[in-house]
Structures are given as structure tokens and as C-alpha cells.
Amino acid sequence: MSKEILNTNGEKLGEIKLNAEVFGVEPNLHVMHLALRRQLNNARQGSACAKTRAEVSGGGKKPWKQKGTGRARAGSLRSPLFVGGGVVFGPKPRSFEINMPQKARKLALKSALSAREEQIVVVKDFSAITEPKTKLMAGIIKSLELSGKILVIADTMAEENKNLSLAAGNIPSVKLLLPSNLNVKDLLEADFVVMTEKAVNVITERLQ
């Protein structure tokens, strides 16, 4: 399987062969689901905290005598029955982290790439962005006939892509990603995936 390599004007420069073991596998929906769940869970802060009746300040004194008032008996104003009292079984700080074997994580990425294979656009590089200006990136999007959510995978540290981050920063529908940060969530959310030729090679080497 192969893809055309385009310049940023949408003109064909050549072809690149995509590794079928990375871009042509049968998408495994279950493994992709597990990877997505892991990614979302691992992003959770897990710092929610509510105080129990033992942790709320005050409430040490019995509010009224046990008998003779006509009221229900009470031992503390910090009981969960009172406003301002402690919370029963409230949240406590905890880790939501989920582990996943490396082999399964790789399969999830391969599945996501294969599921998006038809929406992948390969460009040589972004050296045409000579200045960090939004209009240059907007022009490239128009030339490549892209729409919706666009995921751009490129090494923004490379000399030929040095202006890419600033040029794309003000376009809400464009998300930049380093090849090393490739993840299932961003791949599945994107309508188009734009990769540089170098990024394709880096991803292939990492996943095969």
C-alpha cells in the first residue's frame, strides 16, 4: 500500500510505501477502547476530596441533652445528618491510572492508524511556512482540501518545520503532535491526519 507525497500546494512529488503491518491491520475495536479508556483515566487528576465527620472541624460537644427536649437525639453537629456535617463515603484522593501491556498499546495505535488510513495525507515537510503566520497555514489547509478536525503529525523541532507551531496555533481545528506523542484519542477524533514523510518513517520504525 502506498500514498502520494504532496508538497504544501497539494502537488504530487512522489510516493511513499506504507508498511502494511502498521497502516494495514484489521482494526481491533476492543483494544482501541481499552487504550482510549486508559488514556482518559490516566489524564484524571484524582484529587477530589470530601471530609468525613471525623475530619470536619468542630462538633465535639453534644448539642443538647439526650432526653427531655422532644428533639431527636444527637451527639455532634458534624454528623452527616446536619448541614455543615461530614460526608458519608465521599470521594478521597486516589489514582485512576490503568496499566496496559506495551504490545497491546502498539496494536491499538496500529488499529487507529489503519482505521484512519484513507484520511491520511502525507506531505514532504512544512518548509513553505517561511514566517510564523496563520494565513500561511490556512492557505496550506485550503490547498490540501482539508476540513473538520485536522491532526498534524510533524517534528516541530526540525529546521524545515520551525514556524509550524506558531502558524497553526491560532487555528482551533488544527492540533499539532510530535510523532513520539502519537495516541489513539487524537487519531480517532481527527477528520484528517496530515503527516510529514519523516513522521511516517518514525512511526513505522516505532510500531513495526
Indicate where each model-derived feature is located:
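Extended polybasic, low-complexity segments that bind anionic RNA or targeting/receptor surfaces
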Residues: M1-N41, Q45, G90-Q208
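Short coil/turn segments at secondary-structure boundaries
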Residues: S47-R53
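Glycine/serine-rich anion-binding loops at beta->alpha junctions
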Residues: R53-F89
